[in-house]
């Protein structure tokens, strides 16, 4: 069957989901029937076609009245403020991809369900009372038909959780720290301007800016045994896409750097193929732009100190990789629900 999808919020992730759907050749499995976005349809069409990070979209894009066309495919455009007013029942929507970055509670999910959607997938971490939080490649097999309201976690969680799992399974993690080196985001300023977070009052292109992160909580959601044993900090840097994560863990078993690299390389070629990649090329952040993997391990940066402290550097395209995982999780939800 073809999963009928509606997208709520057509920002960075919403637009990349549409692009990834067409570029990955999965249109026989997923069709986008509607997009709800408060911005005007002409702007939606323009930003789908032309993207500073990802270039021109290969498909023809045009807008006619309340429809957006990608090639010959017509997508209904909505501008509803209220979730309760969305016509998901009328449109036969199977899964809503809520990409607003604003909604994430069970109440918000239930509003989509009340409007007629069968399932809801949030493109960001949700509240603890959601039916499931998925990092595709790690725990999607735990999805059940009764799971209606699901979170796809965050781009950084999708990046680091597979690597943590691999290291923990192999060597037994005792504790860890994570530093996220994240590209600038829309909640930062072009030039100095007011913001509740005083660090984010400063021009994004001129500084490395520390910001709050809930990544440690995201890690312990998947690995409760690490409660109070993982900490995370984050900085934003003056690039517009791609993120690096510096992961340091202490482990129970003694290990060498080449053994860590061999473990991660084999995983990239085997059980985590398509989710984790591995490289020893002398690459920089822009080289990972438009990479569909959740995580790319940079083997040249792996270090081991005292046989028990492992440091790794993991890259991800925080937009493109995550958009591809949204599609993967959508299909996983549909597979268990509609078979």
Curated annotation (Swiss-Prot):
This is D-erythrose-4-phosphate dehydrogenase. Catalyzes the NAD-dependent conversion of D-erythrose 4-phosphate to 4-phosphoerythronate. One of its GO terms (biological process) is pyridoxine biosynthetic process. NAD(+) binds at residues 12-13, 318. Pathway: Cofactor biosynthesis; pyridoxine 5'-phosphate biosynthesis; pyridoxine 5'-phosphate from D-erythrose 4-phosphate: step 1/5. The lineage of its organism: Bacteria, Pseudomonadati, Pseudomonadota, Gammaproteobacteria, Enterobacterales. One of its GO terms (molecular function) is NAD binding. It comes from Escherichia coli O7:K1 (strain IAI39 / ExPEC). NCBIfam families: E4PD_g-proteo, PRK13535.1. Keywords: Cytoplasm, NAD, Oxidoreductase, Pyridoxine biosynthesis. Homotetramer. InterPro entries: E4P_DH_bac, GlycerAld/Erythrose_P_DH, GlycerAld_3-P_DH_AS, GlycerAld_3-P_DH_cat, GlycerAld_3-P_DH_NAD(P)-bd, NAD(P)-bd_dom_sf. One of its GO terms (cellular component) is cytoplasm. It is found in: Cytoplasm. Its EC number is 1.2.1.72.
């Amino acid at each position: 069957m073809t999963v009928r999808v509606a997208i709520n919020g057509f920002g960075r992730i919403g637009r990349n989901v549409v692009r990834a759907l067409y570029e990955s050749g999965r249109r026989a499995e997923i069709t986008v029937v509607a997009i709800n976005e408060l911005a005007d349809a002409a702007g939606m069409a323009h930003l789908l076609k032309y993207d500073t990070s990802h270039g021109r979209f290969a498909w023809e894009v045009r807008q006619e009245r309340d429809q957006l066309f990608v090639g010959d495919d017509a997508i209904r455009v909505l501008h509803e403020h209220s979730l309760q007013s969305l016509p998901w029942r009328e449109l036969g929507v199977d899964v809503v991809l809520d990409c607003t970055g604003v909604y994430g509670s069970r109440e918000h999910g239930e509003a989509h369900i009340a409007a007629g959607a069968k399932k809801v997938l949030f493109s960001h971490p949700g509240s603890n009372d959601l039916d499931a939080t998925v990092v595709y490649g790690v725990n999607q097999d735990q999805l059940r038909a009764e799971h209606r309201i699901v979170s796809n976690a965050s781009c950084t969680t999708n990046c680091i959780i597979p690597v943590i799992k691999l290291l923990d399974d192999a060597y037994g993690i005792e504790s860890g720290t994570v530093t996220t080196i994240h590209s600038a985001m829309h909640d930062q300023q072009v030039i100095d301007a007011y913001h509740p977070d005083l660090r984010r009052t400063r021009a994004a292109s001129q500084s490395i800016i520390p910001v709050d992160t809930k990544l440690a909580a995201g890690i312990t959601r998947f690995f409760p045994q690490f409660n109070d044993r993982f900490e995370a900090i984050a900085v934003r840097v003056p690039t517009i896409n791609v993120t690096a994560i510096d992961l340091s863990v202490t482990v129970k078993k003694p290990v060498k750097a080449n053994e860590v690299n061999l473990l991660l390389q084999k995983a990239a070629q085997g059980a985590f193929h398509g989710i984790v990649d591995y490289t020893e090329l002398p690459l920089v952040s822009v080289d990972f732009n438009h990479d569909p993997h959740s995580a790319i391990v940079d083997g040249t940066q792996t270090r081991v100190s005292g046989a028990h402290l492992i440091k790794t550097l993991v890259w991800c395209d925080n937009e493109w990789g995550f958009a591809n995982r949204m599609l993967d999780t959508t299909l996983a939800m549909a597979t268990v629900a509609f078979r």
